[in-house]
Regions:
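Terminal membrane-anchoring module of integral membrane proteins
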Residues: 2-116, 279-445
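Helix-loop-helix junctions within predominantly alpha-helical proteins
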Residues: 111, 117-156, 181-250, 263-282, ...
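Charged, amphipathic alpha-helical oligomerization/scaffolding segments
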Residues: 152, 156-159, 179-182, 186, ...
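Inner-leaflet juxtamembrane helices
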Residues: 162-181, 251-264, 349-376
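Long, hydrophobic, amphipathic alpha-helical segments used as structural scaffolds
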Residues: 165, 191, 273, 300-303, ...
């Protein structure tokens, strides 16, 4: 067709540009860059400014450890989880083709977790049996007294969720840890700089110690404020409340780290835009951003059952404790017992606020703030190839929104707080209606 057109002086028809998927586009770009490299070698041109995508090779484990600042900064929290038997992850030896973080049911950490869990479960069962027995044999069968017992018994049941909600997802948690390790090294190879997490090391140590200090303070406050709360009951609640605090700390640390990584990526991208031939590097930045977005989703996938079940417990406990305190004030006025219940409500709402608020800030920093910096780039000052790469990065952000969710069950953001508060208000009204109905029946009798 082309020969026929040329021989007759006609213009051949234009070709229709094919539609390529992301993998085909990446392959085509790599081929074009490889040809450009061969041409530069043939011309004797310096290759320092040339860019060719690095092939997927097995990274040196010692280099991974060298650039794994996040693991070193948060190691104290990982060790605390191992000591408490919450998440028995292991750090594999530096061997090629072996992930740096792993999970094994036959490891020393897993055996220790089972041993600690057996002791803790024994104490929980003893306290649970004592509380149920005391409630059954108590002459006071009021609805309010049943509510008080439900609060503390429901907290004890969270202990039995640990093997199902936490240990079962150990391999997914190990994948998430390895994603952080690989991401930092990939960031270094792409940008030439490392991700710096300022004050994260100190913050993690403070959160680890504060988790247990807060647990002891809350349980002792219940011992002094609740008349039927014996001192030996607290030994069953210490590790449960501390575990809740540790999971809240883990969520806070990771959300903070996501924001730091996003800020480092945007700074490196802006520095590249101001340099020569930025289009050749922007593709790698796009892949780095997509990896960061997937890592945020992996956090919710790895801990979906644990955080989901604890959110339900927090929601349930907040409603019951709020009703118990309001009901007791209506009947007998303000006493120390109501103060103890308000402490529980305040703790649960603070836990829920931190959980949702930090996820909101992480999603905004990785998504909206990063997108805003891209939109502020003066595209008239760059070449056409760079403009296309910036557009592709904006498309990647819109197609892969950095939304933190619990494996698709629920999106974690500020809207979840308002939804829970509205549900709490609804259920409180229903419970107070039961209260008023019970009072009317007693007055009639």
């Amino acid at each position: 067709m082309s020969f026929w057109a040329v021989s007759r002086g006609l213009t051949p028809p234009g070709k229709v540009a094919p539609m390529l998927n992301p993998n085909q586009r990446q392959f085509l770009e790599d081929e074009m860059r490889y040809r450009e490299k061969l041409k530069m070698l043939a011309d004797g041109t310096d290759l320092e400014d040339g860019y060719v995508r690095k092939p997927d090779t097995v990274d040196d484990p010692f280099e991974l450890d060298k650039h794994d600042a996040f693991y070193r900064a948060t190691k104290s929290l990982l060790v605390l989880f191992q000591v408490m038997g919450v998440m028995p992850l292991i750090r594999n030896p530096p061997v090629k083709n072996l992930p740096r973080t792993g999970y094994s049911w036959t490891s020393k950490q897993a055996m220790w977790a089972m041993f600690i869990y057996t002791i803790q479960t024994t104490i929980v069962v003893l306290v649970l049996r004592e509380r149920v027995k005391k409630f059954i044999t108590s002459p006071d069968k009021r609805f309010d007294e049943a509510i008080y017992n439900v609060i503390f018994i429901s907290l004890l049941f969270t202990n039995f969720l640990l093997p199902i909600a936490s240990w079962r997802h150990g391999p997914q948690v190990a994948i998430f840890k390895n994603m952080w390790t690989n991401y930092q090294y990939k960031f270094f190879k792409t940008t030439g700089s490392t991700i710096v997490f300022p004050n994260l090391y100190t913050l993690t140590y403070v959160l680890c110690s504060s988790s247990w200090v807060l647990s002891i303070a809350i349980n002792l406050s219940q011992y002094f404020l609740q008349p039927d709360f014996s001192l030996w009951y607290t030994f069953a609640y210490y590790p449960i409340i501390a575990m809740l605090n540790c999971f809240c700390s883990l969520w806070y640390v990771n959300c903070n780290a996501f924001g730091t990584a996003s800020r480092a990526l945007s700074d490196a991208l802006q520095a590249t835009i101001r340099g020569d031939k930025p289009a050749q590097k922007l593709t790698e930045y796009r892949h780095l951003w997509v990896d960061l977005s997937h890592m945020m989703q992996q956090l919710g996938r790895a801990y979906s059952n644990m955080y989901g079940m604890y959110c339900l417990v927090i929601f349930f406990t907040s409603i019951i404790a709020a009703y118990g305190s309001i009901s007791e004030i209506i009947d007998h006025g303000a006493t120390y017992k109501e103060v103890g219940l308000f402490v529980i409500v305040f703790y649960c709402m603070c836990w829920l606020f931190i959980f949702c608020n930090e996820a909101h800030f992480a999603s905004r920093k990785v998504g909206l703030d990063f997108q805003t910096k891209l939109l502020n780039i003066n595209l008239t000052a760059v070449d056409t190839a760079t403009q296309k790469e910036v557009d592709m990065l904006l498309v990647a952000i819109s197609k892969n929104p950095p939304t933190m969710n619990l494996d698709g069950y629920a999106n974690i953001n500020r809207e979840l707080i308002t939804t829970n508060i509205s549900f709490m208000a609804t259920y409180l009204v229903v419970l107070l209606q039961f209260k008023i109905t019970e009072q009317r029946r007693s007055n009639i009798a």
